[in-house]
């Protein structure tokens, strides 16, 4: 009986041991790898960071068939304990402690932990293996990380390509493979108006619309073309908000760069005028008559145009005139003073022009830069040369075209004195003369970089003029002079009234 009693006690202990093992396994739940299944990725931003998001469990009632499986598993465990009573002998205290730990672990499991988009799960930490940061090139251990651009990053290593500060926002801008804060990208790449200095707004269709000068590249909002923003009458640049242009008092404004070399009165312009006459003489195209030259205001030039019966070929904005009729013209006698962004104490004088030949005088607007004033003089002197040499009744495209060629060639002689592309064309007329070389530039000591750039703009204006008489006429005249030379082209014009083809 004693043996039988011990056997029952041992059987009871072992049954309880087997049951506790099964209960521990049941309370432990499924394996971590099964609980943390594939997690969807959340995309943040534009072509952006990929965050790892765990699947949150839903509150559902356990299926009924789970209870049947539990009863079946309990029966198997009891049968197994009875079969192996002689092989198992476990201490009661250890079994109780193991059961307590299992219950405690089960109670500590919280299926509704706060969601952290940057925190990887334990399964991910084990499965991702060795990861290298795309920024510092060091291993990414446990903790927060970013997945973007096909690489992994420490949060502090994923930085803006402009300001170099970490990108912590959920949205950012990607240019190629370079990430930017959205504001940094806007500062770098969103066009700003060069006039109001603000970001150019979008139009009704959401597109960024702006105007840009074809030569200077100055960008500005379309509204500045209609809000009376001053525009330089010489270089065509619009006045920025942080700069003041000089008002010439006749509706024209002048930027500071153009004002630096502006010619303001008739006496100041005489040396330039005589240097251009010398340029013509060096081309074997000497003007035999002394033609007066006057600098005038805009109103005086317009009045002289109205009184001129000949020469209907004028640009929308006329800046020079070759007179053939006797008139009284008011010229600028003394250079005005500059004060408070306007001209002061301008002294003018009326002057009666008497006709002594086919040309009465040459008039040019005052206040223009030296190179622009010179190109206008070269153009108007060619009108005078044609009239003095007996060229009559020429079409507008022919006369204005060949005059523009002379203006173009003089400008080139000033800004490209030794490397002119048109050197051969401009000297071909003087091939029979001993003076076959291009005259030196009229400004001693050369010109500044700013003035040279301004001269290149005036060349660009002549070459790209869209008008029929001045634009098409110049291009046809240039092609003829470039192909046949200036002398042969002029002879052909005298005989046929047109350019050689």
Swiss-Prot record:
Subunit architecture? Interacts (via N-terminus) with GW6A (via C-terminus).
> Phenotype of the disruptant?
Mutant plants produce grains with reduced size.
Organism, scientific name: Oryza sativa subsp. japonica
InterPro entries per the UniProt record, alphabetical: DA1-like, DA1-like_dom, Znf_LIM
Q: Where is this region: Disordered?
A: 33-67, 429-448
The miscellaneous remark of the record is: Plants overexpressing HDR3 produces enlarged grains.
**Which protein, by its recorded name, is this?**
LIM domain-containing protein HDR3
PANTHER family noted in UniProt: PROTEIN DA1-RELATED 2
Concerning PROSITE patterns, the annotation shows: LIM_DOMAIN_1 (PS00478), LIM_DOMAIN_2 (PS50023), ZINC_PROTEASE (PS00142)
């Amino acid at each position: 009986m004693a043996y039988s009693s011990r056997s029952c006690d041992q059987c009871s202990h072992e049954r309880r041991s087997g049951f506790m093992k099964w209960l521990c396994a049941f309370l432990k739940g499924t394996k971590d790898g099964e609980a943390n299944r594939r997690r969807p990725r959340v995309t943040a931003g534009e072509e952006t960071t990929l965050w790892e998001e765990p699947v949150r469990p839903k509150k559902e009632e356990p299926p009924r068939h789970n209870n049947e499986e539990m009863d079946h598993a309990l029966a198997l465990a009891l049968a197994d304990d009875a079969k192996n009573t002689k092989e198992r002998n476990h201490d009661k205290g250890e079994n109780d402690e193991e059961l307590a730990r299992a219950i405690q672990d089960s109670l500590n499991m919280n299926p509704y932990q706060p969601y952290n988009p940057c925190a990887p799960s334990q399964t991910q930490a084990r499965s991702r293996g060795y990861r290298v940061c795309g920024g510092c090139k060091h291993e990414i251990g446990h903790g927060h990380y970013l997945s973007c651009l096909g690489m992994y990053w420490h949060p502090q290593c994923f930085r803006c390509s402009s300001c170099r500060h970490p990108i912590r926002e959920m949205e950012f801008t990607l240019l190629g493979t370079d990430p930017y804060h959205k504001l940094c990208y806007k500062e770098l790449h969103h066009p700003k108006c060069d006039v109001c200095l603000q970001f150019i707004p979008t139009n009704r269709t959401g597109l960024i619309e702006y105007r840009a000068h074809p030569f200077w590249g100055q960008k500005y909002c379309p509204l500045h073309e209609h809000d009376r923003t001053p525009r330089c009458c010489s270089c065509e640049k619009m006045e920025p908000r942080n700069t003041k242009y000089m008002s010439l008092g006749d509706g024209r404004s002048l930027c500071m760069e153009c004002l630096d070399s502006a010619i303001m009165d008739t006496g100041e312009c005489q040396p330039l005028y005589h240097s251009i006459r010398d340029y013509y003489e060096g081309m074997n195209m000497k003007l035999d008559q002394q033609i007066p030259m006057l600098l005038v205001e805009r109103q005086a030039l317009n009045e002289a145009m109205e009184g001129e019966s000949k020469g209907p070929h004028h640009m929308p904005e006329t800046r020079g005139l070759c007179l053939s009729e006797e008139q009284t013209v008011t010229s600028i006698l003394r250079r005005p003073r500059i004060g408070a962004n306007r001209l002061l104490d301008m002294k003018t004088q009326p002057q009666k022009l008497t006709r002594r030949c086919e040309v009465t005088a040459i008039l040019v607007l005052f206040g223009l830069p030296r190179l622009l004033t010179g190109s206008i003089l070269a153009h108007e002197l060619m009108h005078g040369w044609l009239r003095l040499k007996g060229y009559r009744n020429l079409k507008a495209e022919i006369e204005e075209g060949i005059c523009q060629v002379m203006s173009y060639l003089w400008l080139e002689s000033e800004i490209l004195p030794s490397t002119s592309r048109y050197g051969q064309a401009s000297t071909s007329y003087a091939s029979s003369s001993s003076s076959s070389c291009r005259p030196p530039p009229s400004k001693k000591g050369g010109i500044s970089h700013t003035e040279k750039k301004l001269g290149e703009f005036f060349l660009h204006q002549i070459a790209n003029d869209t008008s029929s008489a001045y634009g098409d006429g110049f291009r046809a005249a240039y092609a003829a002079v470039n192909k046949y030379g200036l002398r042969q082209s002029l002879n052909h014009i005298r005989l046929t009234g047109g350019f050689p083809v």
